Amino acid sequence: LAAIRDIWGGGGEFSYGRVVLTAYAAARLPVDDALADDADGLVAAMLAAGLDRDAMRWAGVVDDGSVGWAMLALADPDGSAMVSDGELDGFVDDDDSPRQHKSRMLLAGLAGLGRVADAEIAEYGERLGIDLAAQTRWTRMIERAAEVDNPALVTMLAGLGMQGSGWDRMTARHLFHIVSALRRVGLEAEARMIAAEAVARA
């Protein structure tokens, strides 16, 4: 763990590549409540490499309402349970990211994966100042590609929708449509990982 921390906190500007670099080392660590302070980072590292099953082992260690909890709520490959109003409320209340961007990404990801009720989408969309239903030419194109079950076109349009100088430029609306479309064409694993990464990097 000390070596992992050294990589995360190395000199120079922080790079998400450092998180990716530690993915397999993080996956080899035993699940331990004593590592709770590092659990969010360890979960982010594992999910950066798509190691969702390894990351899910830490579900009992991450704090409720933490970033680690949010990433696992999105990444869970067996996720059939809906995220409740209370769980969302706790996360939003504690979110100190700029413009509550992590909360926006969480809501968009959960909505795209069908893991939050319509009532919560409406309530928290208003609370966070986002409208996932608003349409643009791009949203109509990716929705249509999903309707006709064209995973190649959905993937291409998802890539276009993710263009930008950083994850701070990713909008909740774009993430929602990307995740939803990927899930609808059978690329749910990719949808889950993108949603989790969006929260990690927001």
Positions of the model-derived regions?
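Alpha-helical solenoid repeat scaffolds
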Residues: 1-202
